[in-house]
Amino acid sequence: MSTATQSKVVGYLPQDRPPVGKMLLLGFQHVITMFPATVLCALLMHFNVSTVLFVTGLGTIVALLGAKWSMGNYIPLYYGSSFSYIAAVTMVINQLEPGLAFGQPASAATISVVQTGFIATGVINIIVGLIIRLTGGKAGVDKVLPPIITGSVAIVIGIGLGFAALGMASGTCCVPADAYTPQVSLTWWAVSTLTLVITILLSVYLQGKGFIGMLPILLGAVAGFLIAIPFGLVQPSFPSALITPPTFTFPDFTNPLTLSVMISVGIMAIATIPESTAHLYQISLYVDHLAEEQGREKLGLSKFIGLNLMLDGLDDLVNGLFGSTAGTNYGENNSLMVITRNYSGVVLITAGAIAMILGFLGPLRDAVNVVPTAVWGGLAIYLYGVIGMQGIALMIAEKVDLYDPGKLAIGACILIIGIGGTIGYPNGLPIPLLTGVFPFGWPPIATAALFGILMNLIFLAFKPPVVRGTDVLE
């Protein structure tokens, strides 16, 4: 097995195996990096934190081994919970089990129905990956899912969750109306706002500061927890047993809502496909740069776009089979690898194993549950906003022409249908069609995405006239 000790340049390529001690420490760093977002995502979607930690670790290992089996090397990516599915999942859970408090896990029966949506997501990713592998590129997929659609859907996902974030930050989501006094309101706002501001400052001023720069969300949550103590928002809890097995659930394809869930949740894959592709390009660039510095052969991981999406789908199948949230490869773990120059696949497998072990620790779950909702609300304002801004960043990076009336129309309709529907019709748009499939109403984000895809296909089939610049005036 080749190791980085063969070169004077420090760093580990995907095929390298560090010594055991370093391997454990580097793996634990990955777990700490993915922990805040993965846990928060589980709490927001009413999934069991311990189960999500265990299964995301398992999914990461399965994806890494799948790459090793398929191409003879690892694609160094860590899979955690995806925020792109929060709106679609919470809509389904609110239909099946309304009134759940923040962080309260849904029943096994409810989670089993949601899991079918993650199975659908996995299948979609695998199909798209196969198409790319067979056609030799992603140009065909970009025609059906251009950046104006994927970027607009990302904006909808983030901004559409704004109302929920403000409810958590203010306490209106959780405090009974008769107990919601001005003093209570001020207390919640104080804790959530201070948490938000501290987290933003940490994100801005710790960037580029090494490993600690990867932990602004975790540090912000700790700071918010400490702030909440004198405000009386921290409620003590009795510790669980040291070893508490995760609660595994399995997909329920017999529920009458299964088809509706598979459509409304599964289509969210269109938001994660461009994200995953961008992460692969990023990590491929840095891996090849390190290989060049070490005088070793470049791996060219960027040419495995199709395989990477198939592995994403494989990870989602694992999540959907055992009761975790839908996954995505984490940009924060990519950044950690760039900073530490450690791209070892074995280290990532070690990280997955550590996450699986943490899933059995009862006190860890207790520590997460004792953090006040106001603290999570402050973090949610920031994180949800970032999701929306990433959609804008995607369109800027892809140079989307918003002076093109077709693209402008697609983006405009996706935003209004998606955001307006998510906030105004949280249980679904009141469209009296296909009521057997969508008994509570059409899922807003899925409806917005499908409308955008349909309009784009019309424009592809019937090319509109190209009018630019002064031609408009003439």
Predicted feature locations:
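Membrane-embedded helical hairpins/re-entrant loop segments and their flanking transmembrane helices
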Residues: L13-P14, V20, L43-G72, I267-G345
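Short, non-helical or kinked segments that cap or interrupt transmembrane helices
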Residues: F47-L53, M71-Y85, D142-I149, G213-L218, ...
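Intrinsically disordered, low-complexity non-transmembrane regions of multi-pass membrane transporters
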Residues: M1-L25, V175, A179, F238-T249, ...
